């Protein structure tokens, strides 16, 4: 049996550079119904697929992808027919944990870079790391990072144990990690001063 894929998806991560695309498509049922969903694995250069690379601030090779009557065979089905609803829920949970860990890592890298800068930069002959106000701000950054680690680790543990709390904990980890990264990266830039928005340091 063959299937016809039509539709579009915006902001596909690595969509501009991928050779294969995993597509979630409705093969039965109606919109809003969690059943009747099937995963297909499709060659990115197949006729009817159009990829438009987006210029973004990061390096994830985002793309908008359009499917115009793309023919795929039943051999392209990933998993079983019309069982993708449950699979997608699991994938989204794991995806939240993965992006949480990435944001946590970025926050920790920004913090460590800032600590090094505080120990090296002098103002009026005095290391700025000796200023109590900056010490307080660095301590807050450290506390938020350590608390975020606990949240991410709890979500990872729930994934390993296939816990019923996985969705809740993965969502929590993503929320907390995002807030922590925002706080730490902003503080890191502020503590670096004007040089914090240049390419001379990774903070910029």
Mark where each language-model region is.
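A generic structural signal for well-ordered coil/turn residues at beta-strand boundaries
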Residues: 17-19, 35-36, 45, 60-66, ...
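Flexible, small-/acidic-enriched active-site or ligand-binding loops
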Residues: 43-77
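Residue-level signal for inorganic ion chemistry
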Residues: 7, 40, 65-67, 107, ...
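A short core secondary-structure module
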Residues: 2, 6-50
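Short, ordered beta-strand-loop transition motifs
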Residues: 1-4, 57-59
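Solvent-exposed alpha-helices and their adjacent loops that cap or buttress functional pockets
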Residues: 13-17, 29-34, 55-60, 80, ...
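Alpha-helical interface subdomain recognition
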Residues: 2-4, 81, 87-204
């Amino acid at each position: 049996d063959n299937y016809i894929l039509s539709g579009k998806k915006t902001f596909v991560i690595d969509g501009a550079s991928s050779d294969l695309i995993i597509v979630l498509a409705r093969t039965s049922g109606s919109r809003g119904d969690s059943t009747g969903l099937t995963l297909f694995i499709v060659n990115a250069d197949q006729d009817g697929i159009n990829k438009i690379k987006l210029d973004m601030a990061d390096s994830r090779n985002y793309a908008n992808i359009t499917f115009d009557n793309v023919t795929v065979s039943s051999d392209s089905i990933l998993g079983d027919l019309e069982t993708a609803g449950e699979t997608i829920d699991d994938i989204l949970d794991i995806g939240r944990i993965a992006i949480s860990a990435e944001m946590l890592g970025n926050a920790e890298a920004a913090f460590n870079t800032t600590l090094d800068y505080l120990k090296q930069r002098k103002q009026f002959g005095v290391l700025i790391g000796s200023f109590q106000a900056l010490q307080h701000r660095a301590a807050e950054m450290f506390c938020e990072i350590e608390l975020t680690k606990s949240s991410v680790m709890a979500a990872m543990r729930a994934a390993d144990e296939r816990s019923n709390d996985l969705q809740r904990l993965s969502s929590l980890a993503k929320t907390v990690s995002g807030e922590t990264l925002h706080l730490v990266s902003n503080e890191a830039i502020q503590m670096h001063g004007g040089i914090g928005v240049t390419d001379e340091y990774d903070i910029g």
